[in-house]
Every structure is written in C-alpha cells, then in structure tokens.
Amino acid sequence: MNFLVVDDNRLLNRFLTTFLRSKGHAASSLTDGSKVEAWLELNPCDAIILDIGMPKIDGLTLISMIRVRYADLPIVMFTGLGYDEEAMQIARKAGANGYVSKGLGPSEIYSALLRVIGQHDAVPKAA
C-alpha cells in the first residue's frame, strides 16, 4: 500500500513514513497542506494521514478540497488535540474516515490506517 502523511512537523513526518516503510509499504510526506492536491494528481495513494492544525491550510479545509476529486480516498485525521469528542465529530462531518491522537504510538496509528482501509474496501462501489 502507498500512504501519504501530511503534517507540518517534519520530524513526525519522517518518523511515520519510516515506520510505514518498515511495515513494507510505500510512504511519502508533505509538510505543506497546500501541496496535497498537486501531489495526489501525480501520485495515487491508498490512504492519507492528515494533521488537523497546519499553517496555510488546516486539515478540515483540506479534507473538503480532497473530497471534491477523491471522494473514496481513506483519510485519517491526526491531531494533538487528543480524543476530543467535538473535534472527532467535526472531522467526521468534514469527511474523515478515522481520527487518531498524536499521543498514540506508531502501532496504534498503523491500526487506525488499516481499519479505515478495511472500511473503505467494505463499501460497495457504485455502478
């Protein structure tokens, strides 16, 4: 599988992409949310891990933009806000398939990715 990690924290991006690669996946990262749409045009991916709070363009706005062209692409919101119920509902309403706290370890984040991909695969395709 091919994953995209989008977070303005370069160290966290490097850590997550290295972890995903250690699991046998392709993984790329961007620190600037405004570059995601152009990146997706050239690089198909299976899922995105997307930070909610980024400069230039926040994750919630970015989800709305992604959903215009990539309605079925699994997106996991990644946030330092912890498990705030209101933030989780806002993320889901914006189009996120999952929500993960930055306080979790890489294995838990990986499990969340696999869950949303599993949910995505379970959704019947429109004819």
Regions found by a protein language model. Name each.
Residues R10-S28:
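Two-component/phosphorelay signaling modules centered on CheY-like receiver
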Residues N13, P55, Y83:
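The feature encodes the CheY-like receiver
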Residues D51:
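Active-site residues of response regulator receiver
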Residues S29-A47:
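Acidic, metal-coordinating helix/loop segments flanking the phosphotransfer/catalytic sites
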Residues D32, D58-T61:
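Acidic catalytic/metal-coordinating carboxylates
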Residues A38, L60-A71:
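Short amphipathic alpha-helix used as the core "switch/output" element in two-component signaling
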Residues F78-T79:
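Hydrophobic/aromatic residues positioned on beta-strands within the core alpha/beta folds
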Residues T61, G82-G98, S111:
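Alpha4 helix (beta4-alpha4-beta5 surface) of REC/receiver domains from two-component response regulators
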